[in-house]
C-alpha cells in the first residue's frame, strides 16, 4: 500500500510550494487507495507558532485535502527518538562526540586553508578513553567510510553520493534534543511511509536520512524531489511576484479549486490540458510524470483559472462565499440577474464583491474624468427625460430584456444614439465608467432607486454649465 505524508514546520505561514507537495502526495495516495498522513515538525520549540500550526490545518480544510488519522506532532515524540538514539549508541552505530565548538571551528578553518571542504574528522568515532570534563557531548551517527550511498529518485533519476562526501553528522544536540534528519527518518519509518514527495531543496538531506534507515534496518522509501517554483525571471519566488501564504489567497478571493488546479500544473502535466477537476487530477496523476525542470509562477494564469472557476460556481454558493467579503444576501430574482453578469467580469471574489457593493450602494460622488467627458447640460436634460420615461413604465420591473427594449424605443423617439445615453446612465448608476450592463444594474436595484440616481446625476450635469 502506498503511504505518503506532508510534514510542514509551523514556523510561519503555509506557502504554495508546501501546498503543492502536499497535493502531489495526496493525489498519489488517494489514486492508489493508500494513505495520506500529516506530520507537524515542531521540534524547533523556540520558533514554533501555534497560529502557524492552526493555519496549516485550516489551509488543508479550505482546499479539501483530507489526511488519514490524527496529525502527528514531533514535539510529543522526544522520548521515542531518545530510545532510538540510545539503541544506535548501544549497537556501536552512533557515539558521543566531545569536540567543543571552538575545536570544531578551528578544524574547519584549517581545512579551508588547505582548500578542503570543511567536515568533521571522526576523532571521537572510535574513542575509548576518558571523556574530557565539562563538555556536554553531542551524538553523531557513523556514516559509511567507503563506497556510495545510492538511491533512485523518481524525478532526478539515479543518485550516487560518495562516502567521502559524508561525515558523521549530529543526530542529538548537547542538550539531548534530536536533529531534523534523524527525527524525519524515524517518523517516516514508523509511520510506514513508502513514498516521499518533497521539494528538491531536501535533496541533500536524503543521503543523511538513508544512513539512519540503514543503521536501524528500516526500509528506504521511494523519493521524488520536485524542483522549486520560481518567479517568471527564473529566480526564487517571493511576495513581489504575487506569491502569498495559502490562507492569504482565500482572503484575496481565490477559490480552492483554482488554487489546486494552478498548483498541480506547476511541475506536472497531462498533455495540453489546463483545467483539472479533483476527479481528473486523481484519474490522471502519476508521480513518474513530475517534471524535472523548475516551473514558473504565472500570476495572470492564476487569475485566469480563478476567473474560470468563479464563472462555474453556482450562484447560491457564490453568495455564501461573498458573505465573508461583507456582502449582504440578495433576493433570488436580483441574484439571478446580477451574478451571471458579474461573474464574467471578476477575476477574484474580492473584485466581485467590490462590483456588487458599487451596484447596491448609491454612489457618493461621480468620477471626475467621466464627469468632464459627459457632464453637461445637454446630457443632463437627456437623463431627466430618461428618468421620466422610466417612471412611466409599468412592465419593466426587474427584467433587463424589457428595460432594454423599452429604452430602445426611448432612443428612437428622441433620435439618440445608445452610446450618448448609456455613458451618462452608467455614470449616474455607479458613479464611474465600466461595470456590467446598465439594464442588469437597473433591474437589480429597482425602478425607484434607478430613477433617484439618474435624477441626481441630471441635476449635477445641469449645474455644471
Swiss-Prot record:
* One function term, GO molecular function aspect: glutamate-tRNA ligase activity
Q: Which reaction does it catalyse?
A: tRNA(Glu) + L-glutamate + ATP = L-glutamyl-tRNA(Glu) + AMP + diphosphate
Q: Specify where it is mainly localized.
A: cytoplasm
Cellular location of this protein? Cytoplasm
Q: Which residues bind ATP?
A: 239
Please tell me which stretches of this chain the record labels as motif 'HIGH' region.
8-18
Which is a GO BP term held by this UniProt record?
glutamyl-tRNA aminoacylation
What this chain does, per the entry, is described as: Catalyzes the attachment of glutamate to tRNA(Glu) in a two-step reaction: glutamate is first activated by ATP to form Glu-AMP and then transferred to the acceptor end of tRNA(Glu).
| Name the UniProt record assigns to this protein | Glutamate--tRNA ligase 1
Gene it is expressed from: gltX1
Amino acid at each position: 500500500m502506498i503511504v505518503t505524508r506532508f510534514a510542514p514546520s509551523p514556523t510561519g505561514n503555509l506557502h504554495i510550494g508546501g501546498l503543492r507537495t502536499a497535493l502531489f502526495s495526496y493525489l498519489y495516495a488517494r489514486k492508489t487507495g493508500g494513505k495520506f498522513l500529516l506530520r507537524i515538525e515542531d521540534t524547533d520549540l523556540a520558533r514554533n507558532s501555534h497560529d502557524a500550526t492552526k493555519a496549516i490545518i485550516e489551509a488543508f480544510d479550505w482546499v479539501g485535502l483530507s489526511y488519514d488519522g490524527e496529525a502527528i506532532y514531533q514535539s510529543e515524540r522526544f522520548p521515542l527518538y531518545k530510545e532510538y538514539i540510545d539503541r544506535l549508541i548501544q549497537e556501536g552505530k552512533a557515539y558521543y562526540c566531545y569536540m567543543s565548538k571552538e575545536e570544531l571551528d578551528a578544524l574547519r578553518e584549517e581545512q579551508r586553508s588547505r582548500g578542503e571542504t570543511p567536515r568533521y574528522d571522526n576523532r571521537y568515532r572510535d574513542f575509548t578513553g576518558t571523556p574530557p570534563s565539562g563538555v556536554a557531548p553531542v551524538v553523531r551517527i557513523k556514516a559509511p567510510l567507503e563506497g556510495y550511498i545510492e538511491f533512485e529518485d523518481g524525478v532526478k533519476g539515479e543518485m550516487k553520493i560518495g562516502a567521502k562526501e559524508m561525515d558523521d553528522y549530529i543526530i542529538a544536540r548537547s542538550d539531548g534534543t534530536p536533529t531534523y534528519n534523524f527525527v524525519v527518518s524515524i517518523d517516516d519509518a514508523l509511520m510506514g511511509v513508502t513514498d516521499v514527495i518533497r521539494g528538491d531543496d531536501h535533496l541533500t538531506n536524503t543521503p543523511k536520512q538513508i544512513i539512519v534507515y540503514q543503521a536501524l534496518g528500516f526500509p528506504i522509501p521511494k523519493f521524488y524531489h520536485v524542483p522549486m517554483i520560481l518567479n517568471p525571471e527564473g529566480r526564487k519566488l517571493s511576495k513581489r511576484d504575487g506569491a502569498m501564504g495559502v490562507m492569504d489567497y482565500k482572503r484575496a478571493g481565490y477559490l480552492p479549486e483554482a488554487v489546486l488546479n494552478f498548483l498541480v500544473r506547476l511541475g506536472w502535466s497531462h498533455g495540453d490540458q489546463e483545467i483539472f477537476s479533483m476527479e481528473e487530477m486523481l484519474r490522471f496523476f502519476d508521480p513518474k510524470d513530475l517534471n524535472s525542470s523548475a516551473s514558473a509562477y504565472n500570476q495572470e494564469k492564476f487569475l485566469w483559472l480563478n476567473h474560470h472557476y468563479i464563472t462555474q460556481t453556482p450562484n447560491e454558493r457564490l453568495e455564501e462565499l461573498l458573505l465573508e467579503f461583507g456582502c449582504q444576501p440578495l433576493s433570488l430574482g436580483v441574484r439571478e440577474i446580477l451574478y451571471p453578469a458579474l461573474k464574467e467580469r471578476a477575476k477574484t471574489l474580492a473584485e466581485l464583491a467590490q462590483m456588487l457593493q458599487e451596484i447596491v450602494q448609491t454612489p457618493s460622488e461621480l468620477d471626475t474624468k467621466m464627469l468632464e467627458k459627459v457632464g453637461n447640460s445637454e446630457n443632463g436634460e437627456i437623463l431627466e427625460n430618461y428618468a421620466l420615461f422610466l417612471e412611466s413604465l409599468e412592465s419593466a420591473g426587474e427584467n433587463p430584456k424589457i428595460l432594454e427594449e423599452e429604452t430602445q424605443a426611448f432612443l428612437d423617439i428622441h433620435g439618440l444614439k445608445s452610446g450618448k445615453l448609456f455613458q451618462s446612465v452608467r455614470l449616474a448608476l455607479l458613479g464611474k465608467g465600466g461595470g456590467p450592463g446598465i439594464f442588469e444594474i437597473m433591474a437589480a436595484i429597482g425602478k425607484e432607486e434607478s430613477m433617484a440616481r439618474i435624477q441626481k446625476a441630471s441635476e449635477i450635469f445641469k449645474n455644471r454649465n
